[in-house]
Amino acid sequence: MKKIIVICAIFFFVCLFINSNYSDEVSFEKRGIFVSYIELNKYIKDKDINTSKNNINKIISNIKNLNFNLVILQVRSFSDAIYPSNIYPFGSVSEEGVSPGYDVLKYFIDLCHKNNILLYAWINPYRIRNTNDVGSISSFNPAYKWLNSRNVIIDNGIYYNPSSDEVIELISSGVLEIVKNYDVDGILFDDYFYPSTDCDYNEYLSSDMRVSYDEYKLDRVNKMIRSVYSICREYDVLFGISPDANIDNNYNKLSADIYTWLSDNKYIDFIMPQVYYGFFNESKTFKNVIDEWEGLIKNPDIELMIALAFYKVGNEDKWAKSGYNEWVNNSNIIMREIILSRNLKYYGGFSLFRYDYIFNDSMYTENTLLEVENMKKVLK
């Protein structure tokens, strides 16, 4: 009898332990804040090392004090790097090709991990410049040698050609350099994929692929995504994408094959759609959009994170049509969007775009502080 009691007791505590671990796992919510090249320009570029590091200290302190646990740091915005690279020149934290005097990425990572904060390295894979100014590209930049080749496209900005195998190799090598040398927790690509609808039509015509032009473009992006995912898997680093929340735009204009990414197990670990809508947006409501994204996930191992538009707080939203004043008339939208997102089956967390709109008082609207206070109520 005593043996039975002991066995039952052991079984009870084992079950309790398993359930406790499971509860901790599912209750962990990633709460991210985007720190973009704009913040890096402001707080690091042209600053001495001590001032620069103190500014980073303040960024991490602010994020931690708001009960956030993920920094999404833009490490490559314009074919550059905020860390010493053998592939890309320094950029965002300094003039292109000029060292800031220390390893900014390593400093961010060490400080984040010291404060129990995750760090995802955020990359723009194809963008070189957001203008057509080729003169701004230094000879240190890998794009420089390709300016007169098919590997670079100039079309309302300067971009790497997604159809090029050399470009795919460049992007993959850049990711490998990060995950091999830095203790990042994740790699995140954003929504810059094909720069225009017909930028590489000649390459398509000369290819031996017997598919439509649209299928060709999807295939070229998918090849790059598979390559990067494979590299991240090898180094046990999560890989995800933060695409435009408009599903039609992704597939038909940007050649972002979200249907395949969310169904297969060879592309991504998480998806973070930029659901920059309110509840009264006339074209797309927040609720409908997050439900659409959840419905696309066929691989249950993929985590759904929702990127939220803190930059709209207190501002008119001209694209919302009849709902253009929603962000002006309300100061609890972010809080309500977080609560609603938590009901999603594959929910893994949320993120806010971007740091300065939350913590830089020179950018505050009349609603900012109240929106933050309301958000705090659901961030215990």
Question: Where does each model-flagged region fall?
Answer:
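Substrate-binding cleft of secreted/luminal carbohydrate-active enzymes
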Residues: 265-285, 300-380
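Alpha-helical scaffolding within the catalytic cores
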Residues: 58, 105, 225-226, 245-262, ...
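Catalytic domains of carbohydrate-active enzymes, especially glycoside hydrolases
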Residues: 54-80, 181-186, 266-270, 347-349
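Polysaccharide-binding and catalytic clefts of secreted carbohydrate-active enzymes
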Residues: 52, 62, 69, 106, ...
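Hydrophobic faces of well-ordered beta-strands that scaffold small-molecule active sites
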Residues: 31-35, 71-73, 119-121, 187-189, ...
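Acidic-and-aromatic substrate-binding clefts and catalytic sites of carbohydrate-active enzymes
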Residues: 41, 49-51, 76-81, 98-99, ...
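Active-site-adjacent "subsite" loops/lids of carbohydrate-active enzymes
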Residues: 28-54, 120-121, 126-177, 181, ...
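Aromatic-lined carbohydrate-binding/catalytic grooves of carbohydrate-active enzymes
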Residues: 66-100
